């Protein structure tokens, strides 16, 4: 277990900038707008082979107990309660505030080791700033400018001295056997509620307010002997509706999470059916070529008649991805979770299935004999051989002639044939078609001296007859 350092403070004092500087990443969203961070975000600060510690970025504590602000405060308090060291971050330019006073009073009740970290020191009179914050009674005050990486070395030296060798933090590992699952969907379909239900704790802020989740938060989980990484993402909307700069950053984070996951769980709201926004999210998953499971949330709230109507609508709107399994769930009450994870396993296994060249060529031969390509302008495309070219999604390269003339309907036929033959569930199948070139095209055959003599003897023999 790694030591854990928590960044705590009011909104917009630069906690996320400090987090990015310490972890040397851009994992935390940073913007001048207060309240960008809401959920806890964990990262690792790696100084050298021997000195690692976890850092947790928290949302700004705004002094409110209700709504989103209250939920953000509870997340920050949960992070502070489990930390081995708390960095109480304040703003050098704005000085002390009543909210800082409240936060400090609460931190002192925790009885956790705490350092005062004064950020945004650049462009200020440091002596005056120290004098103002001296009333907080810290024996050591650290000053930094995280945006300019000023003072970070002194901060790290102080942190290392105060941390225990073993801590309470658990690092996200790089276990290749851990299944990475991204929960995606439009805003307010229940992604955070579902992740919290799976984890059995309020790890993510769940609210009826659309756009509550702004960052992509990853949490490791062991369930029934299997290892997972759950990634809660911000809701995606059509580009024409994305206005705020913060939301645009959130969209980028979500797209990155889709690219990096192994299985995407697309969440739909059963009470609203499949909307244009849902189609936008589904398109992003298909573009990334990721394995897909569709989770239809709030199914328990429908009457029998509404369920029949919903089933008809789903089959109509999702008919172009018949290979993706659909699971009916309730994120709020936890029903359908076992079926959801079974579908995730099937999709993951199919997406990472390995193939031999001989078996895929046999499949291509059977597919070709069963249904040859149609004749186009007197010519037929020839499929000569195929070989596997990768996984997630399963990819096959087909070599032949006149493949540019191959119709899309025949390409879909090959996809469906391979999917059925190899029992591929929940994953797209990709085919790459390459036309072979004749290496002797344009070259004149030059005979050797021996071949020339043999040709002359043959010609004499023919003429002699």
Curated annotation (Swiss-Prot):
Residues 353-437 form the KH-like domain. GTPase that plays an essential role in the late steps of ribosome biogenesis. InterPro entries: G_ENGA, GTP-bd, GTPase_Der, KH_dom-like, KH_dom-like_a/b, P-loop_NTPase, Small_GTP-bd. The lineage of its organism: Bacteria, Pseudomonadati, Pseudomonadota, Gammaproteobacteria, Lysobacterales. GO terms for molecular function: GTP binding; ribosome binding. It comes from the Bacteria. The keyword Mitochondrion does not apply. Belongs to the TRAFAC class TrmE-Era-EngA-EngB-Septin-like GTPase superfamily. EngA (Der) GTPase family. GTP 1 binds at residues 9-16, 57-61, 119-122. Associates with the 50S ribosomal subunit. Residues 3-167, 179-352 form the EngA-type G domain. Keywords: GTP-binding, Nucleotide-binding, Repeat, Ribosome biogenesis. The gene is der. GO terms for biological process: ribosome biogenesis. GTP 2 binds at residues 185-192, 232-236, 297-300. Disulfide bonds: none annotated. This is GTPase Der. It comes from Stenotrophomonas maltophilia (strain K279a).
């Amino acid at each position: 277990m790694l030591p854990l350092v928590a960044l705590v403070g009011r909104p917009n004092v630069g906690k996320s900038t400090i987090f990015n500087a310490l972890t040397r990443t851009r994992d935390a969203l940073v913007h001048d707008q207060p309240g960008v961070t809401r959920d806890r975000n964990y990262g690792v600060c790696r100084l050298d082979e021997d000195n690692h510690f976890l850092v947790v970025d928290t949302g700004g504590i705004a002094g409110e107990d209700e709504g989103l602000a209250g939920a953000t405060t509870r997340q920050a308090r949960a992070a502070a309660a489990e930390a081995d060291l708390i960095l109480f971050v304040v703003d050098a330019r704005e000085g002390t505030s009543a909210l800082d006073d409240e936060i400090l009073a609460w931190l002192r009740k925790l009885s956790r080791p705490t350092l005062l970290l004064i950020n945004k020191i650049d462009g200020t009179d440091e002596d005056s700033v120290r004098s103002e914050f001296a009333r907080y009674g810290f024996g050591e005050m650290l000053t930094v400018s995280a945006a300019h990486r000023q003072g970070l070395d002194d901060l790290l030296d102080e942190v290392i001295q105060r941390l225990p060798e073993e801590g309470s933090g658990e690092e996200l590992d790089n276990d290749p056997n851990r299944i990475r699952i991204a929960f995606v969907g439009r805003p307010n379909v229940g992604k955070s509620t579902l992740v919290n239900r799976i984890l059995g704790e309020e790890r993510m802020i769940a609210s009826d307010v659309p756009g509550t989740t702004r960052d992509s938060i990853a949490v490791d989980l062991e369930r029934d002997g299997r290892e997972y990484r759950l990634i809660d993402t911000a809701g995606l909307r059509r580009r024409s509706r994305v206005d705020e700069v913060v939301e645009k950053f959130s969209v980028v984070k979500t797209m990155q999470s889709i690219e990096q996951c192994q299985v995407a769980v697309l969440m739909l709201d059963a009470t609203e059916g499949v909307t244009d926004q849902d189609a936008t999210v589904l398109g992003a998953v298909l573009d990334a070529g990721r394995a897909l499971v569709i989770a239809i949330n709030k199914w328990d709230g429908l009457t029998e008649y509404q369920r029949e109507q919903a089933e008809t609508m789903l089959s109509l709107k999702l008919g172009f991805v018949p290979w993706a399994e659909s699971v009916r769930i309730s994120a709020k009450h936890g029903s359908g979770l076992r079926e959801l994870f079974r579908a995730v396993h099937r999709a993951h296994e199919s997406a990472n299935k390995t193939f031999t060249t001989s078996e895929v060529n046999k499949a291509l031969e059977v597919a070709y004999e069963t249904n040859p390509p149609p004749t186009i302008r007197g010519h037929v495309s020839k499929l000569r051989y195929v070989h596997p070219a990768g996984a997630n999604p399963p990819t096959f390269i087909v070599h032949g002639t006149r493949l540019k003339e191959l119709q899309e309907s025949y390409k879909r036929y090959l996809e469906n044939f391979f999917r059925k033959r190899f029992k591929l569930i929940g994953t797209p199948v990709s085919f790459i078609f390459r036309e072979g070139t004749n290496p002797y095209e344009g070259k004149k055959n030059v005979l050797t001296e021996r071949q020339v003599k043999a040709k002359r003897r043959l010609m004499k023999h023919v003429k002699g007859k």
